[in-house]
């Protein structure tokens, strides 16, 4: 993610540090930042904040009901009461009944804060060799072996299938895996 940000928005400082308070102070002192946007900052309670937006993946909204390492949650679901807004992602890959059940359950936890439904839409395909881009329709009817190292491989797989790619194989690596040349 860090490298993607560096490549796609190079004019915006992107700091990487497990100590979010330290990186926040650095952003303010070195770059005169007025606003800080943090990935995975919700559980860092030492941080002062003005707005907490929590993203929840509609494909696995409640993280197997357990905190890491048994599940995917970083905190108990009740912690969502601290959020100012919930963004429910991947709603395009779920049926409406499932979304309604999710929202009703979330309402029982968070009350009336905004819950925004979002979709992931593939805009283009980019070659790993030279950065050439192609329209997503290029995938239609193509035989594909796909691999990924992301938090939600099921969504990636579903995106390929929805675009008409014929999956010959699908390999999942751990989130943020650094690929070797042989892979």
State the predicted function of each range.
Residues 1-110, 115:
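Phosphate/Mg2+-binding loops and adjacent switch elements
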């Amino acid at each position: 993610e860090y490298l993607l940000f560096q490549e796609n928005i190079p004019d915006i400082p992107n700091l990487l540090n497990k100590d979010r308070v330290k990186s926040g102070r650095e952003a303010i002192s070195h770059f005169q930042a007025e606003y800080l946007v943090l990935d995975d900052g919700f559980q860092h309670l030492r941080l002062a904040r003005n707005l907490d937006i929590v993203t929840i993946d509609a494909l696995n909204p409640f993280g197997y009901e357990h905190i890491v390492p048994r599940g995917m949650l970083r905190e108990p679901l009740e912690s969502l009461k601290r959020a100012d807004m919930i963004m429910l992602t991947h709603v395009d890959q779920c049926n409406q009944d499932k979304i309604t059940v999710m929202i009703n359950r979330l309402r029982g936890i968070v009350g009336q804060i905004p819950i925004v439904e979002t979709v992931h839409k593939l805009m283009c395909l980019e070659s790993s060799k030279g950065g050439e881009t192609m329209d997503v329709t290029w995938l239609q009817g193509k035989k594909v072996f796909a691999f990924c190292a992301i938090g939600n491989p099921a969504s990636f797989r579903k995106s390929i299938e929805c675009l008409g790619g014929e999956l010959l194989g699908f390999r999942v690596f751990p989130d943020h895996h650094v690929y070797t040349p042989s892979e």
